[in-house]
Amino acid sequence: IKDLLKQFEFNVSILPGNHDDLEMMRKICDDQITLKSVECVNKPFAVFNFDTHVQDNVRGYLNIKEIKNLENYLSENKSTVIIFTHHPIIKVGSEWIDNNITENNNVLIQLMLKYHDTSFHIFSGHVHQSFYKRINNIEFHTTPSTCYQFKVKSQKFCVDKILSNGYRVIALR
C-alpha cells in the first residue's frame, strides 16, 4: 500500500476503520502519508479528517479534541466545511448497521447546527453502501465499499448480490 500511495505527488491522509490494524498502518506513515487528523484549510472550503477508529470495537467515537479544533475554526471562518470519517455520523436505515455508527455523534451534529450559516458535507465509509441525507445545513454521504456492498435498508446482515464494488469521487473546486 505504501508503494501505491507514494506514487501520488501530494500528501495522503489515511483514516483507520474498525477492521484496520493501527500498528501496521503506522508503519507506512511518514512525511507524505499520515494517520493524524489534519485540517486542510483552503478557502472557499476547509477539509477536516476525523479519526473515529476505536481499537477492537465496531462502533466509532469522535475525538473531543478534534471537535474543539473544528469549533475553533468555525468561530473565525464561514467557509464550507468538508469532514471525512470512517464511521457514519447518522443512521442509514439498515437496523443492523445503525447499531454501529459513531457513538457520540450528537456532539458534532449540535455543533454543526449551531453554525447554521455554514454548509457542511460529511463523507463516511463503514456501511458498504451509498447513502445521502440532508438535515438543515448538513449533507451526509456514505461511500460504497471497494469490495462488496450491503443491501440497503436491511434489518439483518445481507450482502447485495447485484451491486459490485464501488467508490466515490469527490471533486473540490
Residue spans of the language-model regions?
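Short, electropositive alpha-helical surface patch
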Residues: 1-11, 100-110, 135-146
